[in-house]
A protein has these predicted regions:
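Active-site catalytic microenvironments for nucleophilic, acid-base chemistry
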Residues: 14-18, 78, 213, 217-221
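Helical element adjacent to the flavin cofactor pocket in flavoenzyme catalytic cores
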Residues: 1-35, 39-49
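Short, conserved active-site loop motifs that form the nucleotide-linked donor/cofactor pocket
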Residues: 19-21, 124, 193
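Short acidic, glycine-rich loop/turn motifs
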Residues: 43-55, 97-99
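General beta-strand structural signal in soluble alpha/beta enzymes
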Residues: 23-24, 66, 195
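C-terminal catalytic lobe of FAD-dependent flavoproteins
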Residues: 111-112, 155-237
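Mid-domain beta-loop-alpha active-site segment that forms a flexible
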Residues: 1-12, 70-71, 143-150, 199, ...
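Active-site substrate-recognition segment that forms the wall
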Residues: 30-32, 38-39, 58-189
Length: 237
């Protein structure tokens, strides 16, 4: 069990040291494959961008990787790529440790209820549950109650549930899951458009491996794993 947010922050810092540039608060409003000459993107800066909102500007790339989760459905529909992705909603909560002796020392999986409980430094995180849902919405009270109940059953009194607002963090996240349960990793039928989508609940677990395999394919190298079962071509993409 690891802290995926901390990993992402450290990964961003490392990639920036290697020359990677990030464009936050920027909308990709159009994708235009140019056979033999790369991919043109139309970008729009939002009001939250440090430079303020602006009119559209263009950018050209040799190739692009679409890894935008459910947002990829709307991005690629104008190009005729109909992604077979569905939204699966998961919940988690985290709270500060009250009594270290009562808190978990390693990850625990409640297989009956599909809930994991893990120690992350001085906090305990409880996550689990999967249900079909929408991309937006408030956390489900029933789903959160199942997490609280599992925590109380396994580690009663281990965390501080009172205190100031925000001391207990409740979270709702949406995972993009392909209809056949397999991710979409590889080249699409459009030149220069590559996909890395639909990992579902395994996203955090396979993120690095999927990225490495895709980078190998884009670089003309044979990946260490066979991506045939994850090819977008199986879905006509």
């Amino acid at each position: 069990m690891a802290n995926c947010r901390k990993f992402a922050v450290l990964l961003r810092a490392q990639t920036q040291r290697l020359g990677c540039q990030f464009e936050f608060n920027t909308i990709v409003s159009r994708i235009e494959p140019q056979p033999g000459s790369g991919v043109n993107l139309t970008l729009t800066l939002t009001a939250s961008h440090p430079g303020g909102a602006s009119s559209d500007r263009g950018a050209r790339f040799d190739a692009v990787v679409i890894c935008a989760g459910l947002a990829a459905v709307g991005m690629l529909a104008p190009l005729g790529l109909r992604l077979p992705l569905q939204a699966v909603v998961g919940h988690s909560l985290s709270a500060a440790v009250r009594e270290p002796m009562d808190a978990p020392q390693s990850a625990v999986l409640d297989a009956r209820h599909g809930i994991s409980i893990a120690r992350l430094g001085q906090r305990v995180r409880v996550a689990g549950g999967a249900e079909w849902g929408r991309e937006s919405g408030a956390p489900s009270k029933a789903a959160l109650q199942r997490l609280y109940s599992a925590l109380a059953d396994w580690f009663p009194g281990a965390v501080r549930l009172g205190g100031p607002a925000g001391s207990v963090q409740e979270w709702r996240g949406v995972q993009a899951t392909a209809s056949d349960g397999m991710p979409l990793i590889g080249a699409s039928r459009l030149p220069g458009i590559w996909l890395n989508l639909g990992h579902g609940q395994a996203g955090w677990s396979v993120a690095c491996g999927a990225a490495r395999a895709l980078a190998d394919r884009m670089g003309g190298r044979a990946p260490d794993i066979d991506l045939a079962a994850s090819s977008p071509q199986r879905c006509g993409l």
